[in-house]
């Protein structure tokens, strides 16, 4: 399984950026984004920033990663997915029939 990580830009030169997530830093390509500033949250997949995230999205993705770890350890993981409990799943707009 491949996961995108919600990382925060620490420094950037426009082409690449040093990004951080939970104490880990890595240099990632910024070629798919239009030069976001330091402090911006980005979704990083295979050392490439693929889209901008707002703070809430970054928090939710981080919680989901924690939930996956808890599930793999055999622990209860509901608290990590509080935004999904007690609601029906929803298809993205582009998959809904009109």
From Swiss-Prot:
> Do you know which SUPFAM superfamilies this protein is assigned to?
HupF/HypC-like
Coiled-coil regions listed: none
Query: Alphabetically, which GO biological process terms does the record hold?
Result: protein maturation
Any one GO molecular-function label of the UniProt entry: carbon dioxide binding
Entry-linked Pfam families: HupF_HypC
Q: Which InterPro entries match?
A: Hydrogenase_HupF/HypC
| Family, as annotated | Belongs to the HupF/HypC family.
Q: What's the protein here called?
A: Hydrogenase expression/formation protein HupF
